[in-house]
Curated annotation (Swiss-Prot):
Record EC number: 1.10.3.9
Annotated keywords: Calcium, Chlorophyll, Chloroplast, Chromophore, Electron transport, Herbicide resistance, Iron, Magnesium, Manganese, Membrane, Metal-binding, Oxidoreductase, Photosynthesis, Photosystem II, Plastid, Thylakoid, Transmembrane, Transmembrane helix, Transport
Protein name, entry field: Photosystem II protein D1
NCBIfam families: psbA
Broad enzyme group: oxidoreductase
Site (Cleavage): 344-345
Subcellular location: Plastid, Chloroplast thylakoid membrane
One Pfam family it belongs to: Photo_RC
Binding-site residues, a quinone: 215, 264-265
Origin organism lineage: Eukaryota, Sar, Stramenopiles, Ochrophyta, PX clade
One GO molecular-function entry: electron transporter, transferring electrons within the cyclic electron transport pathway of photosynthesis activity
Positions of the propeptide removed during maturation: 345-360
Intrachain disulfide bonds: none
Length: 360
């Protein structure tokens, strides 16, 4: 009898907990995905703050030349970063218990893996939490779909690319200057500027910004005035009102005359779907591009592709980019190797037409 009562009480406690977790009446919705999201994101954020401030130098190239990234080791907000795991670790999973000591774990960049893995799990759970809340409120799942774009981009940069390159030392450092360093090295090694997927991503991000600005300015310019001239037009809107707050016919007519008729949407729902889909698809394609370049399926190579009738090379913009790539490649990991392979494989160029005569 006692055991039966205890089981009923446990079931009642679990039911109360489940109801609270999945309740849409809470100020912040938690959900089942939130049970995993909260501890992982808190862990990632805590470790990142501590590492950014006080982490010791990391032997990123695996050649016993540590690189300092924290504030206490001479960096500032711009130059500081959490340095990726050592090249000596490669793509091995490197938790604290795999190291002989905390000092060794820090020296080999263990915090980077801890932060990245917890962060990726956390943002994936955030995405799942968006779907869960939409489902419980009876909404369509497009918020979850839209957020999948930055999740895919983060996964491509922090997980897929290091795996494809064979080492987490090739991952993006967690800092401002580290991000730019990653971009420069990525261009040098993969020629991302000549990758169609990257071009689509640029069109998605900049096009999305343009369309957002156009839509916002059109709506703001065609608001239905409900206030006097001396009051802010924003006071004419009441939260939850059923009436349109702007004149879509006027906005459609203006934009149709500004460009041409069919460039303007006459359906508000189709318009907002387009505003969401354009940048999302662009970022999806960028993530796909980074994921394929992780396995060295690089951008197009048009180097020395234009020649005259006598076979002499006519340099194009592609050759200028190639020269810049070689320069960036030489500067990258300057102590890890003396001469990059892609530089050594090029045709030998003479530095002088003839040697000067030296009179003894």
């Amino acid at each position: 009898m006692v055991a039966t009562l205890e089981r009923r009480e446990e079931k009642r406690d679990w039911g109360t907990f489940a109801t609270w977790i999945t309740s849409t009446e809470n100020r912040l919705y938690i959900g089942w995905f939130g049970c995993l999201m909260i501890p992982t994101l808190l862990t990632a954020a805590s470790c990142y703050i501590i590492a950014f401030i006080a982490a010791p130098p990391v032997d990123i190239d695996g050649i016993r030349e540590p690189v300092a990234g924290s504030l206490l080791y001479g960096n500032n907000i711009i130059s500081g970063a959490v340095i990726p795991s050592s090249n000596a670790i490669g793509i091995h999973f490197y938790p604290i218990w795999e190291a002989a000591s905390i000092e060794e774990w820090l020296y080999n960049g263990g915090p980077y893996q801890l932060i990245v893995f917890h962060f990726l799990i956390g943002v994936a759970c955030w995405m799942g939490r968006e779907w869960e809340l939409s489902y419980r409120l009876g909404m369509r799942p497009w918020i979850f779909v839209a957020f999948s774009a930055p999740v895919a981009a983060a996964s491509a940069v922090f997980l897929v690319y290091p795996i494809g390159q064979g080492s987490f030392s090739d991952g993006m450092p967690l800092g401002i200057s580290g991000t730019f360093n990653f971009m420069i090295v990525f261009q040098a090694e993969h020629n991302i500027l000549m990758r169609p997927f990257h071009m689509a991503g640029v069109a998605g991000v900049f096009g999305g910004s343009l369309f957002s600005a156009m839509h916002g300015s059109l709506v703001t310019s065609s608001l239905i005035r409900e206030t006097s001239e001396v009051e802010s037009v924003n006071y004419g809107y009441k939260f939850g009102q059923e009436e349109e707050t702007y004149n879509i016919v006027a906005a459609h007519g203006y934009f149709g005359r500004l460009i041409f008729q069919y460039a303007s949407f006459n359906n508000s729902r189709a318009l907002h779907f387009f505003l969401a889909a354009w940048p999302v698809v662009g970022i999806w394609l960028t993530a796909l591009g980074v994921s394929t370049m992780a396995f060295n399926l690089n951008g197009f190579n048009f180097n020395q592709s234009v020649v005259d009738s006598e076979g002499r090379v006519i340099n194009t913009w592609a050759d200028i980019i190639n020269r810049a790539d070689l320069g960036m490649e030489v500067m990258h990991e300057r102590n890890a190797h003396n001469f990059p392979l892609d530089l050594a494989s090029n045709e030998i160029l003479p530095v002088a037409i003839s040697a000067p005569s030296v009179v003894g």
